[in-house]
Amino acid sequence: IGGIDLYKSLNAGNSWEKVNDWWEYYGDPSTYLHADIPAVQFLKNNNGTEMIYVSTDGGLYDSNNQLHSVENLSLDGLGVSQYYSTYTKREDPYQIFAGSQDQGFQRSTDHTNSIYDFEQVVSGDYGHLSSGDDGVSIWSVYPGFAMYYPDASSNISGITWDFEMSGALWLPPLMEDPYDPSSVYLAGGGLSGGHHILKLTRNGNSIQVDEGDYGFNNTITAMAY
């Protein structure tokens, strides 16, 4: 039975056992199921072994031992992500960055083969990737914070600002600052209500926030210049 977690029964449903807690995925994505289970399928392989395939919001898993253990098939080479946003560097080496649904911020930096593999840097939902320096640094949003990678091709963790505003979208749009790549404009929301454009600027290992004076009548859904 699938929900947020997956449960199994080996006695015709008289008792149930949770395969793993959703949060255990972050300790070892290769052997723990990701949260949210939309489908489970039983199949036999060519040797007659019953295989169980589990679809999750973080990829596809299989098990050959009645879910005593699972293996993540999506960590290497299998493209199963749903992308909210992508950004491609405009000059060689043409690295690609992506914000995905539940499979986090990803990047593809090795293009020696015709098929590009992507590395998942962090899990979660990321969108509206933006850069003011042609992809050297990347801004992104998550439901609850904005994040900045000063060196997007190598940084493991980003600098974040938790949303201290109301009235914004679930993934509020971003727009790069054409003069300062360490700054970005975010569609609010407002720090004290209303709907304003916020300017986020990296300040060391933190992010400074300045709210525009003009108040819009409704939620801001898009920005461009």
Report the location of each language-model feature.
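Beta-propeller blade termini and top-face loops
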Residues: 1-225
